[in-house]
Amino acid sequence: MASAFRSSTRLILVLGILILCSVSSVRSWSKEGHILTCRIAQNLLEAGPAHVVENLLPDYVKGDLSALCVWPDQIRHWYKYRWTSHLHYIDTPDQACSYEYSRDCHDQHGLKDMCVDGAIQNFTSQLQHYGEGTSDRRYNMTEALLFLSHFMGDIHQPMHVGFTSDEGGNTIDLRWYKHKSNLHHVWDREIILTALKENYDKNLDLLQEDLEKNITNGLWHDDLSSWTECNDLIACPHKYASESIKLACKWGYKGVKSGETLSEEYFNTRLPIVMKRIVQGGVRLAMILNRVFSDDHAIAGVAAT
């Protein structure tokens, strides 16, 4: 799989931003979900890793990782990046409610490692070699950073590790309050957008502030050590995927039938799960970046650019 993870030029990266608002929603957290995950992660970076991340980002985003966290969704259908379209999710056997890497991490042709878990492993491995690259290293590592940041959001969205037959809920059509949607989109965006509208006056900054307060001294403070426990950076995404399929079974699929209307009861009971997974994605992304960019080689890589 590593040979497939190719690099691009700055031009391609810029063009990805230009089409940011023109691509329809696909299998991924909403724009807001990814922005929150990346903002939370960047705010938890130590000084050295934060400097490396800022150095890898193109100048026009002014050091803001969240400005590019949706980029992998925007380019997934381009010919050059079509191979990445299967890296955003994992299809598991219907009703198994479990995840096994050897069984489930492959694309529709059976090519191994082509899933969001395999992608996180690959891009983490690339970033671990940041201080050892050639003169064009910056472009390779920029893409690796953006893909890793995005996929860490995706793997924490429970319906991204869903059942094969319904494509993670994409084919379960229903209504969200008064408009048409599907179960996957409910978890990708509907719950987040409803929370923003009803609780935060559509202000993403207020929602972010609320989430971060619960990290520092609130609801999740005592959970941080267990969330970031990881003896092997390459293997830890297995755990994140397993968490997601269990949540998909318990909270996503449970009690839902095609054609029905989901509204207040579903929103109120599932909102805490969605918020927690967004935060876990950010906390764990920060953990990975702090570890891969913490050594002298990584800092030397910044000085060399």
From Swiss-Prot:
- Residues of the region (Substrate binding) are 150-199
Matches recorded under InterPro entries: PLipase_C/P1_nuclease_dom_sf (IPR008947), S1/P1nuclease (IPR003154)
Q: Could you state one GO biological process linked to this protein?
A: floral organ senescence
Instruction: List ligand-binding residues for a divalent metal cation 3.
Output: 29, 34, 154
Annotated residues for binding of substrate: 29-34, 73-79, 88-91, 98-103, 122, 139
Q: Which cofactor does it need?
A: Mn(2+); Ca(2+)
GO MF terms, alphabetically ordered:
double-stranded DNA endonuclease activity; endonuclease activity; metal ion binding; nucleic acid binding; RNA endonuclease activity; RNA endonuclease activity, producing 5'-phosphomonoesters; single-stranded DNA endodeoxyribonuclease activity; T/G mismatch-specific endonuclease activity
| Positions that bind a divalent metal cation 1 | 73, 88, 150, 154
Q: Which terms are listed as keywords in the entry?
A: Calcium, Disulfide bond, Endonuclease, Glycoprotein, Hydrolase, Manganese, Metal-binding, Nuclease, Signal
Presence of keyword Repressor: no
Q: Which residues form the signal peptide?
A: 1-28
The induction text for this entry reads: Directly induced by NAC92 during senescence onset.
* Subunit relationships: Monomer.
Protein name per UniProt: Endonuclease 1
